[in-house]
Every structure is written in structure tokens, then in C-alpha cells.
Design a protein with these regions (language model features):
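N-terminal intrinsically disordered/low-complexity leader segments
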Residues: 1-2
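Amphipathic alpha-helical packing segments from all-alpha helical-bundle domains
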Residues: 62, 66, 92-101, 111-137, ...
Length: 182
């Protein structure tokens, strides 16, 4: 891992633990165990630092779904188990999920950076293709039309878990969703 990635990870940890307001160049230097001024070399402004963290979040999310094999045919319940497995894997990066949630609110007026966390996130297309493959394997009609909704549902379940809002039975929710599709 390079220094840029190390700084990004430190920023993610800071945001998850202390909130977006804690994201300063000096705090990232301290969190990363780097000499004072190191973060400023890679990110001159606060917005540059936010962009570095946002990009690091995207990189981690893509790594979560790389190399997943989906069987050619599965039942709806098996499809739900596959999606639960993906959800559980992504939820292991709890700091990343918490930081992403905090940044969504912080960046609501910054269209460019917000898009990298939402609709235009580099991971969004591969994740939607993965959802479509799961839906096709489960025999869902119009799988491509339903894939973005499945991604949105998984995203909501991740956010709910990261926020520790309340216990939700993701398996039950996903089974009901998949059984309800035509």
C-alpha cells in the first residue's frame, strides 16, 4: 500500500470515529503516523483531502466484489443467500460504511464528489452487473431493470447497519424482495 492509500485509510478511520469535522490535514498525519505536513503534500486543500478519501472508499468497495462467482442457476432463496454473503462481506468494512454515510451528508452540495459515492461511483456499474447476474441466475424477469433496485436495497441495509439504527434481518428482507419479483 502506498502513502496515498495509507492517508485515505487514515481519513476513513477518522471520519468513522470522530465525524467529517475531524478530517484535517494535521489529524490525518497524526492518525496515519506520518510526519506533520505529509497529508498536505498529497492533498493541498480540504476538498482535495475529501476527494482522496472518497476515491479510497471507491477502491475498497470495488475490491469487495472482485472475483465473485455466481452459479448459472439458483433458487430465489439461494440468490438471497448470495446477496447476504456480499452484504456481510461489505459490512466487515464498518469504518468505510460509516465514513461513506457521513460523507453523503457532508457532500450533499458538492455534486462532483457526491456522485463518486452514489450514482457515478466507479463501483456502481460492476455492482449493478453483479446484481443483474444474480437476478438472471434466479430466473427473475427483466433482471436488468431490477438490478439497480437490488443494489439500492443492499446499500440501504449497509447504511442501516453502519448507523446501528436498529436490528434488521437482512436475510428476511432480501428473501421477501427476491420472492416478490416476477
Amino acid at each position: 500500500m502506498g502513502r496515498r492509500e495509507h492517508i485515505g485509510d487514515a481519513g476513513i478511520g477518522l471520519i468513522a470515529r470522530d465525524g467529517v469535522h475531524a478530517l484535517t490535514h494535521l489529524q490525518v498525519d497524526t492518525e496515519a503516523g506520518l510526519p506533520r505536513g505529509s497529508t498536505s503534500y498529497y492533498a493541498r486543500t480540504r476538498r482535495d483531502l475529501l476527494a482522496l478519501v472518497v476515491n479510497r472508499l471507491s477502491e475498497g468497495s470495488q475490491a469487495d466484489i472482485n472475483d465473485l462467482e455466481i452459479p448459472a442457476s439458483v433458487s430465489r432463496q439461494e440468490a438471497a443467500e448470495i446477496v447476504v454473503g456480499i452484504l456481510e462481506h461489505m459490512a466487515r468494512r464498518a469504518d468505510a460504511q460509516a465514513a461513506r454515510g457521513a460523507l453523503l451528508f457532508e457532500l450533499r452540495d458538492d455534486v462532483e464528489l457526491r456522485e463518486l459515492l452514489t450514482a457515478e461511483a466507479p463501483v456502481r456499474r460492476p455492482l449493478t452487473r453483479l446484481a443483474e447476474r444474480i437476478l438472471v441466475a434466479a430466473g427473475v424477469d427483466q433482471a436488468s431493470a431490477h438490478a439497480p433496485d437490488l443494489v439500492g436495497l443492499v446499500d440501504a441495509l449497509l447504511m442501516y447497519r453502519a448507523a446501528k439504527a436498529a436490528p434488521v434481518n437482512a436475510r428476511k428482507v432480501l428473501r421477501a424482495y427476491l420472492e416478490g419479483l416476477g
